[in-house]
Amino acid sequence: MTFQLHAPFAPCGDQPEAIARLSAGVRNQVKSQVLLGTTGSGKTFTIANVVANVNLPTLVLAHNKTLAAQLYQEFREFFPNNAVEYFISYYDYYQPEAYIARSDTYIEKSLLINDEIDKLRLSATRSILERRDTLIVSSVSCIYGIGSPENYTSMALVLEVGKEYPRNILTAQLVKMHYQASPIPQRSAFRERGSVIDIFPAYESELALRLEFLNDTLTSIEYSDPLTMIPKESVPSATLYPGSHYVIPEAIREQAIRTIQEELEERMAFFDDRPIEKDRIFHRTTHDIEMIKEIGFCKGIENYSRHFTGAPPGAPPTCLLDYFPEDFLLIIDESHQTLPQIRAMYRGDQSRKQSLVEYGFRLPSAFDNRPLTYEEAQKYFRKVIYVSATPGDTEVQESSGHIVQQIIRPTGIPDPMPEIRPATGQVDDLLEEIRLRLSQKHEKILVISITKKLAEDMAGFLSELEIPAAYLHSGIETAERTQILTDLRSGVIDVLIGVNLLREGLDLPEVSLVAILDADKEGFLRSTSSLIQFCGRAARNINGKVIFYADQKTRSIEETLRETERRRQIQLDYNKEHNIVPKPIIKAIFANPILQTSKDSESPKESQRPLSKEDLEEQIKKYEALMQRAAKEFRFNEAAKYRDAMQACKEQLLYLF
């Protein structure tokens, strides 16, 4: 099946040329290209057109979950008849295993897996293995190790009507595929009822598989509603994929156990003069081996991943990228931020594991349960398009001149030319600008501060003046950041103050003023690239205005002014030539079910009275249901609050006994 693009508008401005050049580059085997597109020029629409033109399996890589979810929603709308999937880390909460030698403190791994995201991850791998019309939007989670595609596909169960499947062997196979027997219809489960077996695939929530038998002969396969089991479609055959990426064929498991034991013996010899570490590594690893023998799984099994893939020490881990065919298209969105993030992942992982291995908590093979290094990731960059308004030196060099500019905005709105005002007295001046915007135009304001503390203080100061304001920085969790952005667009707040508001991939047409405090403090967040990105946040509004509060013109400010003037003039010339009058962007407030906070959701609150045993048990059930619903809708922060409230109730319950 081919990609079928659905869009209510046709390419315009720079888009037709950008689409044609990028598509030709992919077809002509150009390894790296850059789409240098200004904010609001329709880069996502351009990429969607390229995907439809070249018709290749595609991975879109974003640098955070918020942006990934926005892109996922947009591509689903562009390709409603194709497999658009979502692949991010499935942890609502994750505390990695660690050992702090100076205090002799071992921290056990603690996590909470989001069931809905786990389903979407499995759906993504299933789609890319079955269909070429697959587009997966992913965070950098795609460079972390998961089970090998060879093991995953070898454990898939192919079912055909008319063939014999001894029931005891079939159910045993389902258990090996990480499906559990359960009378309740739930994901990754199966149930037997007389001559019928119902299977609830790990990667589906809308369909169940009903198998009917005559003795051991499979007589019918039906896709059914998972709750009512009303048939939807009868098929002659079906393929059921495993319930986990970490399934292990029996022959490979036996071989892996042998190599783990060999590594254990080597490590015990290494610790011969350190009895504590020797005893520790022996007991921990032996326990894991016994668990793998008995149930095919153990806690922390990913630390033995090299043994299950048969790879040599130091070899790259298998990851989502290995599930794609050789000719896949890679789109790296906001590449100026995503590429540095890929570089950073490996170093942080290795430093944490060093002490675990050194003190006998893990075998050295645990080092190979890791993300790809940047150099390893580059081997997958066979057909890549870097997308950014401010591409870095890496992308420019890699593309060897294959840079496609997309400066023209379909709306006709030119880049606002920044005004430079003194940093002395900047808060008072900004306050006047805010009041002017709110009293006359009811428009929104972004303020860029130099520190988190200043952002928090500024938000508090404005709130005291009865100006609805909030701050946004890295200390706020993903889902809460998303809610704050929604609040800004919907009018709950009018002013948003942050340190690095670039990282959100902000698409806020209501913002008409961007004010950058201390713009002359040269550095990472006041570089040319950052300043241009900040300016772009006001370029979606017809009344867009940018103010740099600076006592001197730094080199970054001067370069930003020159580049802004260049882009502005291109847009103005285009508008004049085509008689275009700038018009505002009318965009619905983002209603992605993955991120949207339900209006009827309940916030966990402290009880106003002592609770009885029955009250606490009822509260636990309520919070668990709310947690699961919030997690299913990707409201991560809310889910975590419900989890904490549920845990608090459980702890209170203990004191009643």
Curated annotation (Swiss-Prot):
Residues annotated as binding ATP are: G37, T38, T39, G40, S41, G42, K43, T44
Compartments in which it is found: Cytoplasm
Q: Which GO MF terms are attached to this record?
A: ATP binding; ATP hydrolysis activity; DNA binding; excinuclease ABC activity
Give GO BP annotations, semicolon-separated: nucleotide-excision repair; SOS response
Q: Give the PROSITE patterns listed for this entry.
A: HELICASE_ATP_BIND_1, HELICASE_CTER, UVR
Q: What is its main location?
A: cytoplasm
Q: Where is this motif: Beta-hairpin?
A: 90-113
Q: Does the keyword DNA repair apply?
A: yes
Specify one Pfam family: ResIII
The record's InterPro entries line, in alphabetical order, gives: Helicase/UvrB_N (IPR006935), Helicase_ATP-bd (IPR014001), Helicase_C-like (IPR001650), P-loop_NTPase (IPR027417), UVR_dom (IPR001943), UVR_dom_sf (IPR036876), UvrB (IPR004807), UvrB_inter (IPR041471)
- Domain UVR span(s) in chain numbering: 617-652
The alphabetized UniProt keywords are: ATP-binding, Cytoplasm, DNA damage, DNA excision, DNA repair, Excision nuclease, Nucleotide-binding, SOS response
Name a single GO cellular component: excinuclease repair complex
Note the PANTHER family from the entry.
UVRABC SYSTEM PROTEIN B (PTHR24029:SF0)
Q: What is known of its domains?
A: The beta-hairpin motif is involved in DNA binding.
Q: Which family does it belong to?
A: Belongs to the UvrB family.
Q: What does this protein do?
A: The UvrABC repair system catalyzes the recognition and processing of DNA lesions. A damage recognition complex composed of 2 UvrA and 2 UvrB subunits scans DNA for abnormalities. Upon binding of the UvrA(2)B(2) complex to a putative damaged site, the DNA wraps around one UvrB monomer. DNA wrap is dependent on ATP binding by UvrB and probably causes local melting of the DNA helix, facilitating insertion of UvrB beta-hairpin between the DNA strands. Then UvrB probes one DNA strand for the presence of a lesion.
Q: What is this protein called?
A: UvrABC system protein B
Species of origin: Chlamydia pneumoniae (Chlamydophila pneumoniae)
